[in-house]
């Protein structure tokens, strides 16, 4: 599951800026909290107490070890953010969390693609991969995603080429989905109370599809795609 925050509300722009502004280049480091036993892998530039606004990444792990392109252990979460620093009180590395990635049914699959995506991330924030190495977006395509946006922030979500499910909350406002795959992607509008297509207003504007809730307080624009059917929705 990919959870957006206000900082990552426009997901395509966020990922592009993360790649551009990530200045750390190395293998990252492991740490274990003596107070909680929590294992972490972190990569980024330590603020040393003064915010630097530089992107960073923290992985929550159980019994984890890593060498470039190879690791063992169980990944509980991967969080992109900025302003990385060590919190002595918690004996943990922390950051301003901006994009939270986890698996709602357990650990994140630690495939070969994931291992190389982590390498690409820590070497310059290359979310789309580094040279011949896959990136985080390749992992999203491999595994599929469930993307959960914000309340009231007019998010822009992004399909990655696998089976993506876009979850819209009651009060999600007017969101946009780019790179929607008509063959496999799903729009979850169950929180709107919609039980079928009859509970939605669906129109075509140029090459886009515009979907509105029954009370027109929430909406979705699917860019560059028309011809959606009930198979593209998850209803209440």
Show the residue positions of the predicted features.
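Acidic, glycine-rich calcium-binding repeat modules characteristic of RTX/beta-roll
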Residues: 1-30, 148-198, 217-218
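Predominantly extracellular/secreted and cell-surface proteins with exposed
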Residues: 28-73, 81
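Glycine-centered tight beta-turn/hairpin loop motif at sheet-sheet or coil-to-beta transitions
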Residues: 50-56, 172, 214-217
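N-terminal helix-cap/turn-to-beta initiation motif at the start of protein domains
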Residues: 136-144, 156-158
């Amino acid at each position: 599951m990919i959870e957006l925050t206000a900082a990552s509300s426009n997901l395509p722009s966020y990922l592009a800026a993360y790649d551009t502004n990530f200045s750390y280049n190395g293998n990252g480091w492991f740490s274990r909290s003596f107070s909680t036993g929590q294992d972490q892998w972190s990569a980024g530039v330590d603020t040393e107490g003064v915010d630097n606004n530089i992107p960073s990444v923290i992985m929550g792990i159980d019994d984890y070890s890593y060498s470039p392109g190879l690791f063992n252990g169980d990944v509980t979460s991967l969080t992109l953010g900025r302003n990385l620093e060590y919190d002595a009180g918690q004996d943990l590395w922390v950051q301003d969390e901006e994009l939270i990635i986890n698996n709602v049914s357990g650990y994140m699959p630690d495939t070969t693609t994931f291992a190389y995506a982590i390498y690409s991330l820590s070497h310059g924030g290359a979310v789309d991969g580094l040279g011949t190495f896959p990136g985080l977006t390749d992992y999203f395509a491999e595994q599929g995603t469930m993307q959960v946006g914000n309340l009231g922030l007019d998010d822009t979500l992004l399909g990655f080429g696998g089976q993506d499910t876009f979850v819209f909350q009651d009060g999600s406002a007017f969101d946009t989905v780019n790179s929607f795959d008509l063959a496999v992607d799903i729009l979850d509008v169950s929180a709107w109370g919609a039980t079928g297509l009859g509970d939605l207003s669906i129109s075509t504007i140029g090459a886009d599809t515009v979907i509105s809730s029954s009370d027109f307080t929430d909406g979705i624009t699917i860019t560059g795609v028309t011809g959606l059917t009930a198979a593209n929705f998850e209803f209440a």
